[in-house]
């Protein structure tokens, strides 16, 4: 495979590197109040576009069937909002004995308390060909659940309390997730034949929107003068984040593929991504609300800012491997279910 062909195939990873570099060179473009106006273009337009796109591309019957998959939804929500933060808290009891910056460690705990993302898990599940409808439901449901659960978890593990405006966050999520999804489904009914004939690149469109989200996030990071990190702590945190993601992806994979799990290979794909991914678009505003007035807010935010692109990068790299496994597993299951021809 030639270099250009390889770059074309891995364009999303290349895009992540380029947008981070662009944010580093000129962060003022994508900061809040800057020319791109991310407080509008990202918070409302970008997230709405991702879910309108999903509503347009998803068959209604697939979305309806996903609502009934209670066992899968229960697994994902319990893993991401109960097991994840508890396991990280235990892990941090050991890490607190090391010279790693204590505020970065607190940041790791805040990452664990976040709900599933409203975009990346859906996009990666779609890229693999997994149960996209289940991923969408868990992303939306997890986000709404996170409005109440995440502040309570932060209070439990970090002792931070604040009057969180549940109503405004809930209404914002409803307008940017549920409404665009429904509108997308309605529009699909009228242009269904055209969509099936033309097959628009829905996955690529969502990925481009996600690159914009990453760009503005890093613009905020690089333009913040309060972030003062020692190289050792930063490198160790990056390593720990990748370790956590790989370990939890493997754990959810083993659980969901166990003999009596009852999950299909497509379900496993949605479970692996939805259970281990954490929301940045909901997480950063939530941290700003819960940790209002904290001088170390920027340091606490760093692990989440690293975790978000790391989960996309790692997920993108693993897409071909997971897709290959899913297809081979589906083929094997299909063969075992075929009736044997009597001799």
UniProtKB/Swiss-Prot annotation:
Q: Which InterPro entries match?
A: Na+/solute_symporter_sf, Put_Na-Bile_cotransptr
- What is the membrane topology listed in the Swiss-Prot or TrEMBL record? Multi-pass membrane protein
Provide the protein's localization. Cell membrane; Endoplasmic reticulum membrane; Golgi apparatus membrane
Ranges in the topological domain labelled Extracellular: 32-37, 93-116, 160-163, 223-234, 292-298
Please state what the protein is called: Sodium/bile acid cotransporter 7-A
Cytoplasmic side of membrane: 1-10, 59-71, 138, 185-201, 256-270, 320-343
**What is the role of this chain?**
Involved in teeth and skeletal development. Has an essential role in the biosynthesis and trafficking of glycosaminoglycans and glycoproteins to produce a proper functioning extracellular matrix. Required for extracellular matrix mineralization. Also involved in the regulation of cellular calcium homeostasis. Does not show transport activity towards bile acids or steroid sulfates.
Pfam families, per this entry?
SBF_like (PF13593)
**Protein keywords:** Cell membrane, Endoplasmic reticulum, Golgi apparatus, Ion transport, Membrane, Sodium, Sodium transport, Symport, Transmembrane, Transmembrane helix, Transport
Entry's family note: Belongs to the bile acid:sodium symporter (BASS) (TC 2.A.28) family.
Q: Which Gene Ontology BP terms does the record give?
A: sodium ion transport
Which GO molecular function, any one, fits this protein according to its record?
symporter activity
GO CC terms for this protein? endoplasmic reticulum membrane; Golgi membrane; plasma membrane
Q: Could you say which tissues express the protein in this record?
A: Strongly expressed in small intestine. Moderately expressed in spleen. Weakly expressed in skeletal muscle. Not detected in other tissues tested.
Record-annotated membrane-spanning stretches: 11-31, 38-58, 72-92, 117-137, 139-159, 164-184, 202-222, 235-255, 271-291, 299-319
Q: List the disulfide bonds.
A: none
